[in-house]
A protein has these predicted regions:
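A glycine-centered beta-loop-beta connector
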Residues: 1-7, 52, 60-76
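Charged, alpha-helix-enriched surfaces in structured cytosolic catalytic cores
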Residues: 26, 73, 104, 108
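The conserved cystathionine-beta-synthase
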Residues: 38-56, 63, 82, 106-116
């Protein structure tokens, strides 16, 4: 973003050689961000992701207790963790439901997976609107017919998607 502010306007009357000359004289210190947002090496990944999203930055310097730079965390690092958390690299079937917030719903759904011979690889809930949630989970070794027959009796669940991954 800072580089965009330093770039010449497309409406400039300078020729390409003058532009290159001016840019060659420009120093990093003249365009760098001075108020840098950082995280500590002991902070959670969730905190780092939140800071990045709220501040619209793709990377954050990571500091140790003494305030020394020890690394950098990037969007790519966050995506890698997200992929692992979602079980993307593991074979199974993913179901996504829209539902209301009901105590015991996750327990009931987990029991149906268990009773259908399955094992949950990943499970996530996402609030959407009006007290409703999206539930997305991935399971392996699932007797799909048995699972779908049992889950169809749960009126509060609306199937949004089913994907073999």
């Amino acid at each position: 973003k800072d580089l965009l502010y330093a770039s010449p306007s497309m409406a400039t009357t300078l020729d390409i050689w003058e532009l290159h000359y001016l840019l060659s004289k420009l120093k990093v210190k003249e365009i760098m961000t001075k108020e840098v947002i950082t995280v500590r090496e002991d902070d959670s990944i969730v905190k780092a992701a939140l800071e990045m999203a709220e501040n619209k930055v793709g990377a954050l310097p990571v500091l140790n207790e003494a305030g020394n730079l020890v690394g950098i965390i990037t969007e790519t690092d966050i995506f890698k963790i997200f992929i692992e958390m979602m079980g993307t690299r593991r074979n199974g079937v993913r179901y996504t439901f829209e539902t209301e917030d009901r105590p015991g719903l996750i327990k009931d759904l987990s029991k149906i997976v268990y009773d259908s011979g399955g094992s949950i690889i990943s499970f996530v809930t996402i609030p959407i609107e009006n007290g409703r949630y999206m539930i997305s989970f991935k399971a392996k070794n699932l007797d799909i017919d048995k699972f779908e027959s049992s889950v169809s009796k749960m009126e509060e669940l609306k199937l949004v998607g089913k994907y073999e991954e």
